[in-house]
Amino acid sequence: MDAATTRVGLTDLTFRLLRESFADAVSWVAKNLPARPAVPVLSGVLLTGSDNGLTISGFDYEVSAEAQVGAEIVSPGSVLVSGRLLSDITRALPNKPVDVHVEGNRVALTCGNARFSLPTMPVEDYPTLPTLPEETGLLPAELFAEAISQVAIAAGRDDTLPMLTGIRVEILGETVVLAATDRFRLAVRELKWSASSPDIEAAVLVPAKTLAEAAKAGIGGSDVRLSLGTGPGVGKDGLLGISGNGKRSTTRLLDAEFPKFRQLLPTEHTAVATMDVAELIEAIKLVALVADRGAQVRMEFADGSVRLSAGADDVGRAEEDLVVDYAGEPLTIAFNPTYLTDGLSSLRSERVSFGFTTAGKPALLRPVSGDDRPVAGLNGNGPFPAVSTDYVYLLMPVRLPG
């Protein structure tokens, strides 16, 4: 599905297709187009009609996206038009068939009684999209979207620290581990997939923004295929390919060293607590109303209860008490409310388990499963061994006043 190989008849492309499928494909490709492209043609989407249907492509030298759409190709060819403009137009069109025809250096688009005439850009100046590396493995689309969203939330956004803007992807046979950190929190997700080879082994760093967009926009279909190569050449192309359901994208890998994260995960806790996620999120939002942006929310844990509080005398104070299953000595700890709610929302669980060491060390959040031993059944005041789970969110506390 390489659009570059089918650029023929550059001035006579004519096709008809359904508005919904056209709008979906154009929008998906246009999402990754640069707002300020280095050269004008990179703001365009390439429409290529052939015997295989319509191919819609976008590329900015870092990220490529390509979607195959069923269409009635009256006359094959290619045309390059503004991606943002075409996306806006196709999403606003009535739900009727769309006719597209290239007329000289303009493209005519008709849908119902609506007609548009758009300028084109030189197809010959458009770069060739990269070829996908060999397929490395596949996993269900829903699992891919969930896992990426769970770890991308913890990735950094400071481009001066590229090692923190990526998601580390570790592959060991049928097991994949995803990890991301911005130094204030760390998210790790482990999952199983169908590897192309049982002995495949690789570790790469992928831009979190690109993976998050891919997960959010969705490839669709039942499976997502990841392509990094096979054998000893895994990751050597410097590209990750993601494909499925007629869509494919590539992104350049980050050439940076991800922090050694496993040594940060505690193996035991001095105190543990479990509580309702939705109830806790609502309480955090409530008390944080009197906290300055990014200010702390304090949590005072004792047997059977936790008190959330925020604010100060000059801006106002707020507190709320919640029921909690707690084991360990009484503990007061504070967190950034945004980072805390991010972690709670990413658990995909009705209840959360907190594992604590001290008020000055990171807390470990994990989803509570039906196999969990009740906190009330734990003896003594610790230490309590960390429970193995497929997702953890490690969060640095905020220094308490005084």
UniProtKB/Swiss-Prot annotation:
Q: Which SMART domains match?
A: POL3Bc
Q: Which UniProt keywords apply?
A: Antibiotic resistance, Cytoplasm, DNA replication, DNA-binding, DNA-directed DNA polymerase, Nucleotidyltransferase, Transferase
Which Pfam families does this UniProt record tie to the protein? Answer: DNA_pol3_beta, DNA_pol3_beta_2, DNA_pol3_beta_3
The UniProt GO MF terms for this protein read: 3'-5' exonuclease activity; DNA binding; DNA-directed DNA polymerase activity; identical protein binding
Q: Name one GO biological process term.
A: response to antibiotic
- Compartments, as annotated in UniProt: Cytoplasm
The record's annotation in InterPro entries points to: DNA_clamp_sf, DNA_polIII_beta, DNA_polIII_beta_C, DNA_polIII_beta_cen, DNA_polIII_beta_N
Annotated Gene Ontology cellular component terms: cytoplasm; DNA polymerase III complex; extracellular region; peptidoglycan-based cell wall
Give the CDD domains listed for this entry.
beta_clamp (cd00140)
Anything further noted? Strains that are resistant to griselimycin occur at a very low frequency and are associated with amplification of a 10.3 kb chromosomal segment containing this gene as well as the ori site, suggesting antibiotic resistance may be due to overexpression of the wild-type protein.
Q: Which family does it belong to?
A: Belongs to the beta sliding clamp family.
Extract the PANTHER family matched here: BETA SLIDING CLAMP, DNA POLYMERASE III SUBUNIT BETA
Q: What does this protein do?
A: Confers DNA tethering and processivity to DNA polymerases and other proteins. Acts as a clamp, forming a ring around DNA (a reaction catalyzed by the clamp-loading complex) which diffuses in an ATP-independent manner freely and bidirectionally along dsDNA. Initially characterized for its ability to contact the catalytic subunit of DNA polymerase III (Pol III), a complex, multichain enzyme responsible for most of the replicative synthesis in bacteria; Pol III exhibits 3'-5' exonuclease proofreading activity.
What binding partners and quaternary form does the record give?
Answer: Forms a ring-shaped head-to-tail homodimer around DNA which binds and tethers DNA polymerases and other proteins to the DNA. The DNA replisome complex has a single clamp-loading complex (3 tau and 1 each of delta, delta', psi and chi subunits) which binds 3 Pol III cores (1 core on the leading strand and 2 on the lagging strand) each with a beta sliding clamp dimer. Additional proteins in the replisome are other copies of gamma, psi and chi, Ssb, DNA helicase and RNA primase. Interacts with the tau/gamma subunit (dnaX).
Q: Write the protein's name.
A: Beta sliding clamp
